[in-house]
């Protein structure tokens, strides 16, 4: 009996060792197979591909990596990874396809938020409006990077002799653009870049409009941006060109005053450069309003005519840049500021063109740029 029990224990021991060795061999083989299916060289770079079930920790790591790469919502990131068997490179491509389709569905939604971006040098400036649906997305670094890149693109596209040129999205949409941002395609078109960002942020994103300004060899371009998340961006922009007659003029003083006038334009909202450039329709419309108001006074026709002319001067002070009270010193007006500057630099200084733009203006009525306040007939 004792012998039988000992023999049984020996046999069981042999069986246990055999099974253990077989299990180790299988485990080693499975590990090697998993390694081969997990690390596949591609163009000299090892890409992680999973041929077997992925652990929870590995899943979370892949979700985190793809989220960092794309800024896409977590649910979309996970869905693409699951669809692509946790292959992160394939999932990134799938995510982009999903995003483009989603962006197309959202393209009809109202996008009245966003940013203005300016790019400029001493003689030229370009400003673009990039819209989105919420101010939250307008604070997104990818959105801001795209807005800045589009302004630089517009500046580079500006032709010689174009002192003032409005443009729509069609000017830039098909142009190639090189984006140096880790979350965006490096080389693409402007339209594809806008669509890619729309897919990334989950909102309707669109390039709405832009303007280009330039000056002569003896002038300067100045700008001011209100509510700036970073330099060259904001919700309201003022730009102005100042022209001088003498090439020896000290332009530093002209630039300084130009920046102040650009800030004035943002604050005072002028519609026209000078009284002579007030459109006939605007002038007649204002006269009609003033006549109606004067008639209720019960005064004589002569008295009412004087009343209308007096109130018309007040209208000019409200909407004509040269007649407006200077926001930095309301005891003088812009015309006097320019006269004083001309004396200081020894050369006559005049305003060539100006622009005031605000994010979302006019969008509720029309997508055209009718909400833009520009330099009347000075265009």
UniProtKB/Swiss-Prot annotation:
Residues 1-33 form a transit peptide. CDD domains: UBA_EF-Ts. GO terms for biological process: mitochondrial translational elongation. Its main location: mitochondrion. One of its GO terms (molecular function) is translation elongation factor activity. Pfam families: EF_TS. Keywords: Elongation factor, Mitochondrion, Protein biosynthesis, Transit peptide. Disulfide bonds: none annotated. GO terms for cellular component: mitochondrion. It is found in: Mitochondrion. NCBIfam families: tsf. Associates with the EF-Tu.GDP complex and induces the exchange of GDP to GTP. It remains bound to the aminoacyl-tRNA.EF-Tu.GTP complex up to the GTP hydrolysis stage on the ribosome. HAMAP family: EF_Ts. Belongs to the EF-Ts family. This is Elongation factor Ts, mitochondrial. The gene is EFTS.
């Amino acid at each position: 009996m004792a012998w039988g029990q000992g023999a049984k224990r020996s046999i069981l021991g042999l069986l246990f060792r055999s099974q253990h060795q077989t299990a180790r061999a299988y485990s080693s083989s499975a590990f090697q197979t998993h390694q081969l299916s997990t690390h596949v060289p591609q163009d000299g770079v090892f890409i992680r591909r999973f041929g077997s079930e992925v652990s929870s920790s590995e899943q979370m790591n892949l979700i985190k990596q793809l989220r960092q790469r794309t800024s896409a919502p977590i649910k979309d990131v996970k869905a693409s990874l699951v669809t692509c068997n946790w292959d992160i490179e394939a999932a990134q491509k799938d995510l982009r396809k999903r995003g483009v389709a989603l962006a197309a569905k959202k393209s009809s939604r109202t996008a009245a938020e966003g940013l203005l971006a300016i790019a400029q040098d001493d003689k030229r400036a370009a400003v673009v409006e990039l819209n989105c649906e919420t101010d939250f997305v307008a604070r997104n670094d990818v959105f801001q990077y795209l807005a800045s890149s589009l302004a630089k693109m517009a500046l580079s596209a500006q032709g010689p002799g174009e002192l003032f040129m409005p443009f729509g999205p069609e000017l830039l949409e098909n142009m190639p653009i090189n984006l140096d941002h880790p979350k965006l395609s490096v080389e693409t078109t402007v339209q594809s870049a806008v669509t890619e960002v729309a897919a990334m942020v989950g909102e309707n994103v669109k390039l709405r409009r832009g303007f280009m300004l330039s000056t002569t060899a003896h002038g300067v371009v100045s700008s001011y941006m209100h509510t700036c998340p970073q330099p060259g961006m904001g919700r309201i922009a003022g730009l102005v060109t100042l022209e001088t007659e003498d090439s020896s003029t000290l332009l530093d003083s002209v630039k300084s005053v130009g920046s102040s006038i650009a800030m004035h334009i943002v604050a005072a909202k002028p519609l026209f450069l000078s009284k002579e450039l007030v459109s006939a329709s605007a002038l007649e419309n204002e006269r009609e309003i003033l006549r109606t108001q004067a008639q209720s006074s019960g005064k004589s026709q002569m008295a009412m005519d004087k009343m209308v002319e007096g109130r018309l001067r007040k209208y000019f002070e409200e909407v004509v840049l040269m007649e407006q009270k200077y926001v930095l010193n309301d005891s003088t007006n812009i015309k006097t500021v320019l006269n004083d500057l001309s004396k200081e630099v020894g050369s006559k200084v005049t305003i060539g063109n100006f622009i005031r733009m605000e994010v979302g203006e006019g969008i509720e009525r029309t997508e055209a740029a009718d909400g833009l306040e520009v330099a009347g007939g000075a265009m």
